[in-house]
Amino acid sequence: EYEDKYGEVPTDRDERLEYIMSKAKDRSRTFSPVKKEMERIRKIKWKTLKYTVYLVPKASPRPRRSMNGHFYVNGAADNKRFFKNFYKETLDVPIIDTPCKFYCDSYLPTPNDMSLVNQFLAEIGLIRPIKKPDFDNLAKTYSDMTQGVLLFDDALIIEGISRKWYSAKPRIEITFKYMEEFDSDYNKKRISKAVRHNL
């Protein structure tokens, strides 16, 4: 199925661009708006929102199956409520509804059985956690908790980094970098439609 749909598309990027432009009836007329849009998109400014939540980082529990066959995540509603209150009380920002980048730094408690030398090295980031929770589960947990509260939809996240650290002061540091405007009319229409659908 993949081969039928995408087999003729080149693997090399320059060849793919040539392939896309080969569909144009008048290449010069098509390329002019492409150049204009490229310049506009490159000039889009990004805003940064950074905040710290003083909790021990935990991944969401795996979904469990109830007796009636439905799936649920134990404690998910409490987590969502906590974060909703946290954002209302701490952050005075409009909901993010443009493409964004998400960075999650999870500081796990430094183990008590570490030597003082290792505790010091862990605090400055030279010794890192290689235990549960997994880095991707932490990122998913904390990006999900922003959905509908700080972030219109986590589908807006176009790039993300999740890192695990040790610290004597456990916490979660979240950074969002988001566009001041949309990168394209195409994406703007998609989000506008989703917003109208949720009203």
Model-assigned labels for residue ranges:
Residues E1-L199:
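Acidic, proline/glycine-enriched N-terminal capping motif
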